[in-house]
Amino acid sequence: SRGLGDVYKRQRIGSSTFYIYNILMKSILGISAFYHDSAASIIVNGKIIAAAQEERFTRIKHDLSYPFNAIQFVLKHANLKLSEVDHIVFFEKPFLKFERLLETYVAFAPKGFKSFCKAMPIWLSEKLFQKKLLFNKLKEHDENFNDRKKIMFSDHHLSHAASAYYPSPFNEAIVLTADGVGEWATTTLAIAKENKVDIKKEIHFPHSLGLLYSAFTYYTGFKVNSGEYKLMGLAPYGSPIYKDKILKNLIDVKDDGTFRLNQDYFNYATGLTMTNKKFDSLFVQPARKANNENLTQFHMDIAASIQEVTEEIMIKLATSIKKEYGINNLCLAGGVALNCVANGKLLEKKIFDKIWIQPAAGDAGGSLGAALALWHNELDNPRKVNSNDDMQGSYLGPEFDNTEIEKILKEIGAEYEIKDEKDLISKTAEDLSNGMAVGWFQGRMEFGPRALGARSILGDPRSSSMQKNLNLKVKYRESFRPFAPSVLREDVSEWFNINSDSPYMLLVSSINKKKCFSMTEEQKKLFGIDKLNIKRSEIPAVTHVDYSARIQTVHENTNKRYYELLKKFKEITNCPVLVNTSFNVRGEPIVNTPLDAFNCFMGTDLDKLVIGNFYLDKKKQNQNLKKDYSKEFELD
């Protein structure tokens, strides 16, 4: 794979050629694909124009296929044909990944022969020839596209680091990326200043914090690459009694946070599973079979233990790099940066003055980072810092105007009322205050895994039954899983022990003590899932069993309609907080279109649906349009 720098060294042979090239530069298409969470992003003159994940269009959760639909969308939104795009950049380098596969097999042979044989055919037929594959796929968008030289490849962790730094509100930062694995790197440290990101240090495969966490995700019966957040949500129900066992046997953590994993206990480098029999023996029982076995206190204690190990490593890494480089700002990306509990602990420790986390921290965000790395790092274009950040609230996906929405609603036979802005906000806030569950579909769809008030299901956080009802009757998901609060930015410190912006729901904090209820001695003795039904605060629907909450601060300048809804709800209830969960059911991607939203509305126990200026009441809909929606999607 040709690296970013390789092509531009040739351009720089003649300075005049380089500068003319720079002036003509306008648009870059970034692509991530073929592992999980395929996505496309486009920037024009360095400005982020659009970004979306392929899963939202295909309705396949974590879709890894070539992001045809996402590319079509971002091109249309940028008003560009593919042949008019100046550069196309893939988020990682396939040749280096193949090198890792070969070297890993050689290092562990003959162990791992089975998985090696399984991986080889697809590498030899497709992945090794990624440029050819991409070129053929790209031509499907525009038959006039014929310049293979436009296709380039970034480094996986540079893509992550660039996605974290360039949209951030900082002109200088330490950038920490951590995930499963890119080409070779699993954790990187970069120093970013002005328009440059310089990777200084790396931890290489098979030593990976992301893969360690995924191994425990697998062991507790959840799906790797999608169930890690469930493991994090399960942790507060347990006690970290296995932490010392993990640190003694599985991972050697140094004082500076660097680490090495003991490969005797893992299969991910050589096998078709994450853990092995020796791992099972260490914890005295085999991996949980998700569909056949209940979660027990053991699994909750395991979750608590690996969560605490992860937090300890992240805190040690952050402390050591702050001490070494003395820079006050931290940017985070990579799948591990979606661990909002660990992020909250970093903020709480005040190691850095400010922390900014890329909302699409996983591989989807790599498409954006690859494009930004090319524009700034390689083409040396200047960077203008936005004090709010450049992600535009992460509202970078498709949107539908009222004309388009009404056309779709008429076609499907929906009953609806059209309301003006004021009436729409008032009626929705009133419904929420009366305990109703509302599907909320407004403006551009979010880029990244979190619903942030554009494609959300909303509820009243004061309700003791809201969490249970949303989990079981609307989302069809496990009862232990917590819900997140959206809160007016100006009121956040009144309700939570935090006074920082958290627009992307990537920081966990505790509920303000003034809003908490004390537990009785009897309640304190409860274990595991029995902790769930205790009312702990004035907002029980968003208060986890450890009095924590994953917070989204809502800002008028990024989502005015959602901000106004929260203000109206506060006016009615004296509470500036709403339950906010993604508009989907378990196993389904977040809804993208009005049709997706209506289908989810009719297939669940949602009471109301608000799409644009259209207000829909479940009771007034044709009951023949209902379906058994819980069977539409494979459970994740």
Give the location of each predicted region.
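Phosphate/ATP-binding catalytic cores across multiple sugar-kinase/actin-like superfamilies
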Residues: 304-330
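Short, small-residue-biased leader/transition segments that mark boundaries at the very start
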Residues: 1-8
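Short, positively charged and aromatic/hydrophobic N-terminal segments
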Residues: 12-21
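Phosphate- and other anionic-substrate recognition elements at nucleic-acid/protein interfaces
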Residues: 96-100, 127, 131
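N-terminal cofactor/phosphate-binding cores enriched in small/glycine residues
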Residues: 28-98
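Phosphate/pyrophosphate-binding loops at sites that engage ATP/ADP/AMP, CoA/4′-phosphopantetheine
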Residues: 72-86, 138-145, 318-326
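Flexible beta->alpha loop and helix N-cap segments adjacent to enzyme active/binding sites
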Residues: 20, 34-53, 58-61, 104-115, ...
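Short glycine-rich phosphate-binding loop at a beta-alpha junction
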Residues: 82-93, 151-152, 326-334, 439
